[in-house]
Design a protein with these regions (language model features):
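Single conserved hydrophobic/aromatic residue that forms the stacking wall/gate
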Residues: 1-13
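Glycine-rich, flexible loop/turn motifs
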Residues: 2, 23-24, 79, 90
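Residues that recognize and position ribonucleotide moieties
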Residues: 4, 26, 49
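Structural alpha-helical scaffold elements that stabilize or flank donor/cofactor-binding regions
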Residues: 5, 32-35, 82-83
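NAD(P)-binding Rossmann-fold cofactor-contacting core
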Residues: 9, 17, 75
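Short glycine-/small-residue-rich Rossmann-like dinucleotide-binding loops
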Residues: 14-19, 46-47
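Rossmann-fold NAD(P) dinucleotide-binding segment
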Residues: 19-42, 52-57
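Rossmann-like dinucleotide-binding domain for NAD(H)/NADP(H)
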Residues: 39-184
Length: 184
């Protein structure tokens, strides 16, 4: 295990090597949280099993961390409801669910298929235009929240955690910032 001096610093970066087939499994475990010198906000949008749920709950309860923003969950769709209630923001694994993300994923898939079959791809993948492409805001934070307010998704999940898969499967299309014109 390698622990650079950055652990607990402003960056809160930790290198850690684990043996075995699943090298990222529970990288953020009890030892990880105990090693933090500051109280960071933990954000997980990568893979649910990267963070050990019980260790994260313990870190939240003992104030080793300031807060948690979780989009991917250990054991989803059967997520830990205690953890969900304690998160600042908890969403149903939808971080990549923007229309732009789906268009990019489709483009990458088509590129790979064309490369594999050695054919020239002649296609254009565009995300649909936003319903209201012009945003009027006082500042950038307000503009971003008009484009997408994650607390709305969080509230839906916290109100009906048993609908995790439905909330994820029926997720409405949203656009990324580049699709909008912001007027301050």
């Amino acid at each position: 295990e390698i622990m650079p001096s950055l652990v607990g610093s402003e960056m809160c970066i930790r290198d850690r090597y684990k043996e075995g087939k699943y090298k990222t499994f529970h990288l953020a475990d009890e030892v990880f949280f105990q090693s933090l010198k500051r109280k960071p906000v933990i954000i997980n949008t990568s893979r649910g099993e990267v963070i050990q749920t019980d260790a994260l709950l313990k870190a939240l309860n003992s104030q080793m961390i300031s807060d948690a923003i979780i989009d991917v969950w250990e054991h989803e769709p059967e997520i830990n409801r205690d953890l969900l209630e304690k998160t600042f923001i908890g969403t149903p694994h939808i971080a990549g669910y923007s229309a732009d993300g789906k268009a990019n994923a489709t483009r990458m898939s088509l590129d790979a298929i064309c490369k594999f079959f050695q054919i020239k791809g002649d296609y254009e993948i565009n995300a649909p235009a936003p319903v209201s492409p012009i945003i009027h805001a006082k500042n950038h934070e307000e503009a971003v929240l008009q484009m997408y307010n994650p607390t709305e998704d969080s509230n839906r999940l916290k109100n009906q955690p048993e609908l995790f898969e439905t909330l994820r499967g029926d997720y409405p299309l949203r656009r990324e910032e580049k699709a909008y014109i912001i007027k301050y």
